[in-house]
Structures are given as structure tokens and as C-alpha cells.
Amino acid sequence: MDTLVEKASADLKSTFTISNEMSEKIFVIPPNRTRYLSEIAENNRVYDKKGLEQFEVAQKLYGIYKTICSVMNVSSNEVEKSLIGKLGLNEDEILQQAQNDKGIAIPKEGGTTDEESQRSLLHLLIKEFDRVKLNLDPYNWEIITTWDEKVKKYKNPIYSFKVRDKDINIETHSESLSHLQIPKIALPKYQAWGDLLKWCLQENVPGEFPYTSGLYPFKRTGEDPARMFAGEGGPERTNKRFHYVSAGLPAKRLSTAFDSVTLYGNDPDLRPDIYGKIGNAGVSICCLDDAKKLYSGFDLAHVMTSVSMTINGPAPMLLGFFMNAAIDQQCEIYIKENNLEAEVEAKIAEIYKGKERPKYNGDLPESNNGLGLMLLGVTGDQVLPADVYAEIKTNTIAQVRGTVQADILKEDQAQNTCIFSTEFALRLMGDVQEYFIDNNVRNFYSVSISGYHIAEAGANPITQLALTLSNGFTYVEYYLSRGMDINKFGPNLSFFFSNGIDPEYAVIGRVARKIWAKAMKHKYGANARAQMLKYHIQTSGRSLHAQEIDFNDIRTTLQALYAIYDNCNSLHTNAYDEAITTPTEESVRRAMAIQLIINKELGLNKNENPIQGSFIIEELTDLVEEAVLLEFDRITERGGVLGAMETMYQRSKIQEESLYYETLKHNGDFPIIGVNTFLSSQGSPTVLPAEVIRATEEEKKFQIKTLKNLHNANDTQSLLKELQHKAVNNENIFEALMEVCKVCSLGQITNALFEVGGQYRRNM
């Protein structure tokens, strides 16, 4: 370079300086951490190898122990149990028992018996036991010695345990119509210590590491795992559907589908490429008032209410709308409890002097009490004292339960609703999680790491699980690189899987829990809460067919059975007509009935670990787990998840597997009833829907009008500039979004962030 400057007589020295807001290279995952997936695979294999070694040691110890019992001619279980203690064999007890038992005799070489030879043999056996026990982990010895206590706890009528310092008492049995006591948890009847230890290390009871059979000792009573997906038209129509699907259920578990306009961060508009999509295949939400109307009539801070939002690119903005809607609901409750309605109404009238106030479009559904609609067009901080509002806000965000999907990695790999550059999207995710930690948001999941879309795009169950878990561990590494505490962000992570009918789907949840728990505990040193992988299951939409659509309910039932037997944390059962149209109220009711019948009527489901102990389930678990770990190694070879994405490895793999399935389906090698075999006399033609449900013109125009009134009512430019300033200066963007979302529309916020974060461009 110096020679070039000299010969050209030109000043080529750069005067560019890097400021605090810039970086030469953005590393989402530090370069020295790109092998994290192979490290996890090795960690889990080491755990399994050590478990097998400990199994061998425990079996030897059991053999020596039973030999001692045989030499002493012990026949009583109580006496046998008295021979072992917390530290090992009770040597004094053994010798005392030998001294007291006159019938015990050990032959000598000459055919005579002698007490000395007996004591000598016992000493040798005790010595050998102690020598072998040196190779047994003390934790594993505790598992062996406390097994009988564990069995007793499950045989007692009531099992007591704690969840977040709250005492829970659960009945351990249910009575059948034949008056048999059916155990909720069935335990193995192993006697040998090695068998017991191996089972505890690899399976264990629900609620204990490695959580293979479930995260909690027992399922919750009074709250079924049902979470039904809904979204169509404007917020009012979807609000009516929410009240319909949750009618009569003690727990209100709402799952929200958004239209493509919202998914891409746009506002409703007359533009031809937007207008036709408003409110179709999802609900149209563009501002805080829309969120208030969408969830009106549901107390969002109630312990029995939970909301899931399937949104990714603009997830932080929709989360801001939701949080502010929940806060304003609690402000409304405060206003009513303190008889402040007239005072608040006067303040709102003053704010909207000469302007049209927002309103709920149409009549409220019967079960909607109007909660959340009092403060349409304003927020609680405009009508309540600052200290009162601050306290309500703090309490509310700590109480709300739910999930926002916000999984940007799977969007690049399978779904395609990316709007910001990958690095900026990940930064937004990190800012949300940081805000959750700083503000004690413990009951809301900041991300739902999703395999469903990967499976729907064509991936087989092993690829779905491997890519989903690899994405999850990528978020763990990224959050750790930002200095977050794994024990604080770990519990805010959740997962979302599809359930088909393939054999691997029978174990997808248990394998996910095992891999996650072992890695989080032994690789990352996380606590028990962070080790628990919580996941939602939706039955496979791809498995539903447009021919013989009545058969789809049979497929969905079998998939739901897989999910419930595998102890999923929540479940959505698809409607049989989803293959041809947006589900009707009738088809949604049938879909809901599928899981209710399994949960309420199916006798075997009274037991909560029905697949444990099955040879094929154990074999499948081992096969799928190793296949996932091998995929981790393949991703590592390509530079980790982000490196593999640069060469479109994940997308290519999904497409190849999709093509393989479609080929087998079309040539008939993969039989599908009513599609390529067992055809009706008419040849099982495609069923056409009686009507295709779409958003009405009135709904579309009302959404555009709502947006126009919002823009006319608020001065937003200063807030948007402040948001951009925080983004450029590496401050927490979501903290600013919580304020911006009160007055700005989704499209305004998206466009403002495009200017500082960059738009998404796919690698070519």
C-alpha cells in the first residue's frame, strides 16, 4: 500500500473512524463458540456413556448385596433394607445379624461349619462391595437408597409437591367404573439396582431430571392442555371466535393467527397488494386499539388466562400492543373499583374534543363483559396519576401469561415472514428478553422456538426436531454472549412442534426434553427451571387432505393421542376442513371435542405416563436422540446454525425431504387412505367448500378507517425519532417500543426500524 501511495503520489489513507454505533463485523455468535452444537452432542453422549458405566457398577453392587443376604439366609425385606444405609452397607448391622442368626452356617473344606468362616466371607464381601462402590457416583447411590421412599409417595392417596413455593396436593389414583384404583403414575417393578438406576438416569418419573416423561409430577387439574388457534377478519370477528372456542372452559387459552399484512409489519391500506389480504387467513391488527378489541372480555392478567401470538418479524411491536392492552385492562379495573368512571370519561372527552373516538365494530358476544374497551383511543397514563399507572404496569407485566412466537431463525429456514435483517431481528429478540429479565416478566415466553413450520414445509420429524433444538441452542448462545443469566432467560424459552403420524412423532416430546435438559444442566450449568423444555403441539396441517375430508378427524385424533400420551404442555387439534377452507364453528367444535374426549373419557389417559416402559418407545427414543445429535454435528461442520443458513443448508434439506414424501405419495408407495388407496366409488375427488370464509369489504374499510383516525389523533414523529435514536445508540429497543406502541401504528414502527436496522434480504 505504501509503494502504491508513493508511485501514484496520492493520499489513499482512510480517514474513516468507527464510532460506538458502528461495527466492522457483527458476530451474533462469538467465533470461538461456533462448535456449540457438537459440544452439546458430545456432552449428551458422555452423560449416556457414564450412565451405562454406572449401570454396570450398580448391577455388581446389587449382586454382592444379594450374595450377602443369601449367605445370611435373609428372607425378610425389612431385614434386607436394614443392611444398607446412606453411605453404603451397614457393616455393624450385617455382623450383628450374622451373630444373632443361629441357623446360618457356612461349610468348611472338611464338611464342618464354623462361625469364623462365615464372618470371614462376610468381611470379604463387604470389602469387595466397598471397593466397587468407589466407582459409583454418590448421587446415584442416593437414587438407589431413596427409591422405596419414592414408591411410597406415589402409593399414598395424596402426593404433595411445590411449584414456585406454592403447595400442590394431588390425588395419586383415580377410580374406574369397575371400582379399580388406577394409578396416575405407574412405576417400574425393577429390583436390581442397575436397572433402577438406568431407568432413573434416562427416564425417571415426571417432574424429575431428565424430564423424559414430563416436566411436572402430575398434570394440572382444572386446566386442560387445549389451546385453539383462531384469527380471521377484523379484531371483533376473531374476538367473537375466541369467546366461542373458550366458552364453558375454566382456563382461557387463546392462540392468535395474524393476516399476512400484519405478519409483514404493514398497515391496512388501499394498495392492491395489501387490500385483498386484510383480515384473510388471520386477524388484522395494526395498533393498540385493535389489540384491546381482540382480547376484550378476557382478563389478560388472570392466572387462568393465557395468550399465544403467532407472529415473528414484527413480534416486538405486537408484543408491545398486547402488554399495553393488558396494562390498560388493569387500569380499567382500578377505575371501576375506585368509582372514577365519570372523571376518566371527562378526560377522554377532552382529549377527543371534535374527533371521532375509536369503537368496537358491532355487538359484543354474549360472554364479553366489555373489559378492555373503556380506554379505547387512550392509555392508562393519560387518565391516571403517574405513580398509580406505574404500579399497575409493574404488577401487570409480571402477571400476564402467554407466548409470542418471535422465532426469526425458523422464518429464514422455512416460513419466510422475515422483515428485518437477521442480525437486527436477533437484536430485537435479545432486547425483549433483556426487558423481561429487568422487569420480572416470568410468566410470558419471549420466544416460541418452532418446528411446526419446518415440518409443514416438508421436513421429516427428525429434521424438525434437530433444526428446532439447534435454533434453540443458538438463542441460548446469543443471549449468553450478551451477558444474560441463563437461569433468568432459560425459563422464558418455549417450543412448538408439529405432530404427524410417523413413528418418530410418538417420542418427539420426550426426546426434546431429554436433549434439552442434559445440555442445560451439564453443558450450561442451568438450574431446574431452565432445564425444563415446555412445548406446544399442533396436529399436522400437512397431513390433512382435500379428498375424503371426514377422514381427517381420524388422523387428527391419532396425532392428538401421540401428543397427550407424551405429556405435551398445550395442544391444538386441527379442524377436518382446514385442507379446503378456514374452519367453521362446527368443525372447530369437533376438533376441540377430539382432545376433550381423550382427556375426559379415554380410560388409559387417566394414567399420566402410559408409554413409559414400552420396548418400542424406549428404542425409538434412543434412535431419534442419536439421529438428532448426528444432525447437530452436520450443522457444526457448516459453521453452526447461522453459517449453515448462509448456504441455505436447512432450506435445501427441508425441500429434499418434502420432495421425497410427495414422490412416495403420488406413486402410491406411501399409502394414504382416501387419497391414493381405499378410494370411494367416485374416486375420492377433491371436496370443494360450501363457502370460502373471507374478510368482508366492511371489515377491511373499518380497519383502514381505524388506522386513519389513529394517525390523525396522534403526533408520532418525535416518538419514532426517539425509537431510532435508541436503536442506533445500542439502547434497549423494546423498552422504547412499549411507549411507541401506545400511539403509533404497526406500519409506522416497521418503517422507522427499517431505516436503522435494515430490511431482510435472502442470501443467494
Placement of each model-derived feature along the sequence:
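Catalytic alpha/beta active-site cores
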Residues: 148, 152-499, 504-505, 523, ...
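Short acidic (Asp/Glu) and glycine-rich catalytic loops that position anionic groups and cofactors
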Residues: 1, 271-274, 300-303, 411, ...
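Intrinsic disorder at enzyme termini
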Residues: 569, 601, 605, 627-719, ...
